Amino acid sequence: DGGIDYQRLSPTIKGRMFTLSYKVNTRPQTSDSYSEYDIAYGHDDWTDYLRRLQDQHNDGSQNTTEHTFQADYTTPIGKLHTIESGVKYILRNNSSDNDRYLRTAADNSDYVFDEEYSTHYRHQNDIIAAYLGYGLKWKKLSGRLGVRYEHTIEDVKYLLGRGDDFRKNYDDVVPSASLGWKLTDLSNLRLGYNMRIYRPGIWYLNPYLNDSNPSSLSQGNPELDSEKSHAFDLSYSNFTPKFNINVSARYSFTNNSIQSVTSLVSEDDIPDLSEDKKTGKDVLYTTYQNIGKSRNLNLSAYVNWNATKDTRVYANLFGGYTSLKGANGLENDGWNLFAYGGAQQTFKHDWRLSMNIFGQTPWIMLQGKGSSFFSYSLNLNKSFMNRRLSLSAFASNFFQKYNKFKSHIEGQGFIQDSWNKYPQMRFGLSVSYRIGELKASVKKAARTITNDDVKSGGGSGAT
């Protein structure tokens, strides 16, 4: 990642500023998996298919590269009013290459490249946006109104594999509004509304058909539309030198939510599955669709307590209720809890020790629920040479080598439970050294680039 901001303040009008920003971001990922089959003990019902079964080697790489250019202008009008405007251009290139290699099952021969089932997919997403905002400050009251226009250009190409190239353009108008009331010099109350657009990431879009498990296939959907989410929130904050707290209640809804959908289907209903890959039986097929209606009610709190000049305790708590409804009568609802907390202690001679704990309950999905999660870490830091040299040691999840994840999905005619475990024990050391003297603090630009429009998660369509 990298970026640069240029900001110019008016020498005559306080609060008037002009900012130019550029940011580049890239997120490469690779995967390498082998699926080898022992066909000697297959059930008689699967004999015909097992004779055609082949070992698989899947070599995959996904990457998203963003270039963002942004210009912002802010100016006061009198003592009470502020006008903001700006333009933004995002050039987002998604790429996904999945190469498949095959050999006869239970054979030690070399793998051979399978061009028919390999895919090289490109998805270019250009976003042109402009916004206009108005701000008001009058006594204890403050308010903001804003509107943003976005024009999106999508260009999809298949360099290798099945799929038709396509290009589409669409427009969105995104409003926002907020109202604040200053209760005291240290506390505030705020009411707000905003609309958010979440574009599917490469994991959701990847069209590669993963059939390494012949009874459970998965595939992304390159024709997904962006989610449009509406949210209302009410928050209270109070900040003192000793104690800080922020409490927020939030309600949000989405009518075209991107959801993972698993169905028990005939293999003839999977267009990218060739005849020689079919088992002759119904199979589970997972993909993503814009079918979900999501309703979320959340309550969150952040607390920071400076117990002494050397001791700090902090916590971030979240509780929410989610209701999901999709096509074909699919629906699910439930509660989700999240907690993050820790403490930091400073000792003599610039020794600092911190401990953090994180946990969450299973998250709600349209057809089931995901896994709970628990993690913890310790960090020890020591400064030397008038804080020029810093040494840090950290350890996380040191009592348990693996973290186990469990998910439960059910639909018409099937129930699927899966268990996975991943290494989670971490140890590390870091060293930093500051060269030169910092005579004054470096000022940051008041405006900079933030891109948070990509929906995270996904992965069923990739190896």
Sequence positions of predicted segments:
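C-terminal beta-signal and adjacent terminal beta-strands/loops
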Residues: 384-463
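Face-selective signature of the C-terminal outer-membrane beta-barrel domain
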Residues: 1-157, 246-248, 295-318
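Outer membrane beta-barrel strand-and-loop segments of large Gram-negative receptors
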Residues: 57, 66-70, 112-119, 221, ...
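Transmembrane beta-strands of outer-membrane beta-barrel pores
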Residues: 8, 24-30, 89-93, 138-140, ...
